[in-house]
Amino acid sequence: MILSDRDIRALLAIGDLVVEPLSGDTVRENGLDLRLGRGFCRFKRSDRVLDPRAPGSPGEFYECGEGDEIIVGPGEHMLLHTQEYIRLPGYVAGLVNLRSTWARTGIYIPATVVDAGFEGQLTIEVVGSGFPVKLYPGDRFLHLVLVKLQSPAMNPYRGRYQGQRGVRLPKLFAKNTG
């Protein structure tokens, strides 16, 4: 069942759902509008193979930083994050969508599920369109549809990305670098 604005406000009121900061326009008819954060990681162009079983450094494949504006180049892949820190209860999952306005610029994001029990800022992959697009931190960028599970998850999310802030690179680097 997709949660309505009324359902979402009820979960916020009892503390089962947390969204920080929570702006007046965050709760929408059937989900949450989330704002773009300042951090980014650009995928570097390289002929080097990223081998998940070999030691490596994320610096070989990503260039990370922060900015007051973020330009996504044509066909460029980037990792971005939300301003909001969220906490989902063990009986709610989320489906991440790009807000329609941004999709109309040609920017694309892959299908992304937020697992029941997840807590943190969302890291999202963005793929550029046929021309550069400038993004501004603080703009409403993603729409998170919340779905109530038929029963609570037996094992809510407790993975490596739990509690993340800013852009989090793939966990395979953490496994191989220390």
Curated annotation (Swiss-Prot):
The gene for this chain is dcd
Asked if the record carries the keyword Signal, the reply is no
**Which pathway is this protein engaged in?**
Pyrimidine metabolism; dUMP biosynthesis; dUMP from dCTP (dUTP route): step 1/2
Q: Which residues form the active site?
A: 125 (proton donor/acceptor)
- Gene Ontology biological-process annotations: dUMP biosynthetic process; dUTP biosynthetic process
Q: Which organism is it from?
A: Aeropyrum pernix (strain ATCC 700893 / DSM 11879 / JCM 9820 / NBRC 100138 / K1)
User: What EC designation does it have?
Assistant: 3.5.4.13
According to the record's subunit comment, the protein's assembly and interactions are: Homotrimer.
Instruction: Report the sequence similarity comment from the record.
Output: Belongs to the dCTP deaminase family.
The answer to whether keyword Nucleotide-binding applies is yes
Task: State the protein's purpose.
Answer: Catalyzes the deamination of dCTP to dUTP.
Query: Which reactions appear under catalytic activity for this entry?
Result: dCTP + H2O + H(+) = dUTP + NH4(+)
What Pfam families does this protein's entry cite? Answer: DCD
Q: Which UniProt keywords apply?
A: Hydrolase, Nucleotide metabolism, Nucleotide-binding
From the Swiss-Prot or TrEMBL record, give the protein name: dCTP deaminase
GO terms of molecular function:
dCTP deaminase activity; nucleotide binding
Residues that bind dCTP, according to the entry?
99-104, 115, 157, 164
> What Gene3D superfamilies has UniProt attached to this entry?
2.70.40.10
* Top class in the EC scheme: hydrolase
